[in-house]
Amino acid sequence: LLSGEVAPASSERASWFARLLALSRLALAEQRLPHTNAGPLSRREMAALARLNPSMGLMLEGLGAAYDALHRRAPSKRLDVRLAQLEQAGRLGVPFTTGLLLGVGETWDQRRDALRLLADMQRRRGHLQEVILQPWRPGGASARPLSPPEQADLLEVISLARRELPPEIHLQTPPNLWPWEALPAALEAGIDDLGGIDAVDVINPAYPQPLPE
């Protein structure tokens, strides 16, 4: 369940959260397993959703000034907030998916440090099930697939992630951002999950899902 975030102090927060619970129950009634990513949650909210969701998620995004600048008007995306959420999920024992947003101006060392931070958290808490390696793409109506240099860079990040993260953590990258013929290279580098393949990618709607013959 993906949702727009509602500020903790908002008068709409209670009804928003009640809807998340109701949709989780509906998914279970339809014999589906919900996975909620709804932004930062209080301990009480996360614990309540965890009783209905086999797993949950929230992107770490990354470390460094590039992310601070990107999210300067989004307080819920501050690094300390995101890290606190990952730690809270670990204390509650919630199986969790997180990830990095790549290509926003971060350095190679910052990528490595973010992966090592997640690896350390996994060794302490044991709750991280998957890390998404999400290349940033420009919005708008026109898609711009990864260029060959961008593909090569992402393959290096995948290989780095596979070396730095514990082996039980799965690695995901969105298949619609790659040329179809280049996906085998991503799998060889360490990707073992191509994520959700829906009719429309809600994160990158201008990028159609691959339709191999």
How should each PLM-predicted stretch be described?
Residues 112-213:
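Auxiliary Fe-S-binding modules of radical SAM enzymes
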Residues 1-121:
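Conserved Radical SAM active-site core
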